[in-house]
UniProtKB/Swiss-Prot annotation:
Activation of RuBisCO (ribulose-1,5-bisphosphate carboxylase/oxygenase; EC 4.1.1.39) involves the ATP-dependent carboxylation of the epsilon-amino group of lysine leading to a carbamate structure. GO terms for molecular function: ATP binding. This is Ribulose bisphosphate carboxylase/oxygenase activase, chloroplastic. Keywords: ATP-binding, Chloroplast, Nucleotide-binding, Plastid. It comes from the Eukaryota.
Length: 32
């Protein structure tokens, strides 16, 4: 995950604090 996109990692965690990562969830599914 960190190797794929280290910059996004921080954004992902930040989204969790703000609320549900609706914009990050689809990206994760595609990566998987």
């Amino acid at each position: 995950l960190v190797d794929t996109f280290p910059g996004q990692s921080i954004d992902f965690f930040g989204a969790l604090r703000e609320g549900p990562p609706t914009f990050e969830q689809p990206a994760m599914t595609i990566e998987k």
